[in-house]
Amino acid sequence: MRCNAVRTGTLRRQIGTWQGIAEGGGLSAPHVSWPGLNEYDSHAVIAAIHHEPLPKPDTPELYRHHFRLLRDGLAAWMAGRVQPAGMPSYVDFRAGVIGALDHVRQNFENEVLLVSSGGPIATAVAHVLDAPFEASIELNLRIRNTAVTEYAFNPKRHQLITYNTLPHLDAPPYRDWLTHARG
């Protein structure tokens, strides 16, 4: 893998992921933190529609309940029916993600690595495909941890090349490493 520039969200886990990629791949591209790549707060999204405390989801039934609430909360946030505490509006969240894509198109010609999280990745994919916001909910809940989504871009637009791939974990010894939300 090679890249000429790196943008990550400002979250510790996103920066840590970049540091691991850089160390493992021997990369030294310039890195800039980009707040528009930050993840939404799933707890705040759920709390916006379900005000009582929830038990830790540690059974199949509680996992299903958690992801039903998350889907409903995301749909309400995206439609502007709720405003989760401490979060931007969905319009602003989406604008931050699109701003990162626009920044890449306007400032680079090739190989830019964006290190983010499921919500921004799904939002970017839905935007590039001109899909309705509801599609980003399902895209988000299918993203596998450490998955790669690849775009081609020119000064006018991005094009989706791959979504949710794990080329770095394709070998048999890594099969047990695959994880994702079971929503």
What feature does the model see in each segment?
Residues 1-71:
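Phosphate-coordination/substrate-recognition cap region in phosphate-metabolizing enzymes
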Residues 7, 110-116:
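Beta-strand elements within well-structured catalytic alpha/beta cores of enzymes
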Residues 20, 123-127:
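Active-site signature of alpha/beta-hydrolase-fold catalytic machinery across serine-
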Residues 27, 32, 40-62, 91, ...:
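Acidic, low-complexity terminal tails and accessory targeting/binding regions
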Residues 78-94:
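Surface-exposed cleft-lining segments at the edges of enzyme active sites
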Residues 94, 98-105:
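Generic structural signal for well-ordered alpha-helical scaffold segments
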Residues 103-108, 117:
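Conserved nucleotide-sugar donor-interacting segment of glycosyltransferase catalytic cores
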Residues 118-122, 154:
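GST superfamily/GST-like fold recognition
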